[in-house]
Amino acid sequence: MTWKGSGQETVGAEPTLWAISDLHTGHLGNKPVAESLYPSSPDDWLIVAGDVAERTDEIRWSLDLLRRRFAKVIWVPGNHELWTTNRDPMQIFGRARYDYLVNMCDEMGVVTPEHPFPVWTERGGPATIVPMFLLYDYSFLPEGANSKAEGVAIAKERNVVATDEFLLSPEPYPTRDAWCHERVAATRARLEQLDWMQPTVLVNHFPLLRQPCDALFYPEFSLWCGTTKTADWHTRYNAVCSVYGHLHIPRTTWYDGVRFEEVSVGYPREWRRRKPYSWLRQVLPDPQYAPGYLNDFGGHFVITPEMRTQAAQFRERLRQRQSR
């Protein structure tokens, strides 16, 4: 399989639907990654599945760069876009912040979860691309927990607390899970209106299923990774692919015969250790990965003996910590 998605346009190349997430361009070392992204043809589309940056000006810079290069850019927010830090020129919070970002994208011609769903009609199509903003509701519970309160208590006891708890305001909703439930209901209503015969590409920053979270080094972090309310969406809404990020574990897996693509870049300290074969991930047409292309866990990077040793040592430390 030939990858063309991180270089200049290739003469005669056919249109491709690409995806990427977790660019985190506010981090030193990641802005050059964004600047290196080019389509392989003038008609390529790009899905940006959240966590572009934290500051509104950096989010604008990143999306503006990409929309000037790709024929269409489709963005969904991650949790980091919804953070309000004291360094942000726009001190807006919660839903007002999300609305501001949607308006920003609208001005640039970038598709968001609030726009009509675009339809990919090139190779691998037709397929309706469904950008979604769903958040999470703490229902991906860690072992030993039967409720959100118990799960959060276990996580705190093990020093696992997402920064969202301090920087992601849910206002005007009372809680982040209340905001999540409103978004899930609104999105489900739109999905139910689709032609059930037409394939979809479901795009969300967070995984629609709990299973991808099993690869997390800190399993308690799953609390901030999605909702069980979307567990059957990939089959119910005829998905040919589910695109997500957030976990910073770039990999391809299949659940119920549906391809799931985790397309994150992650932080420099992460990707420098296990740089993926390509920054951009092909969504359509189906890439048909050759045998041996993906590593043992579906990852898009080589696992070295040193990495295996470090992972085993980490798991042992984690086991000891959890058994205390």
Curated annotation (Swiss-Prot):
It is an enzyme of class 3 (hydrolase). This is [Acyl-carrier-protein] phosphodiesterase PptH. The keyword Nucleotide-binding does not apply. Belongs to the metallophosphoesterase superfamily. Pfam families: Metallophos (PF00149). Disruption phenotype: Deletion mutant is highly and selectively resistant to the amidino-urea compound 1-[(2,6-diethylphenyl)-3-N-ethylcarbamimodoyl]urea (compound 8918). Catalyzes the hydrolysis of the phosphopantetheine group from substrate holo-carrier proteins. Its cofactor is Fe(3+); Mn(2+). Fe cation binds at D51, N79, H205, H246. Gene3D superfamilies: 3.60.21.10.
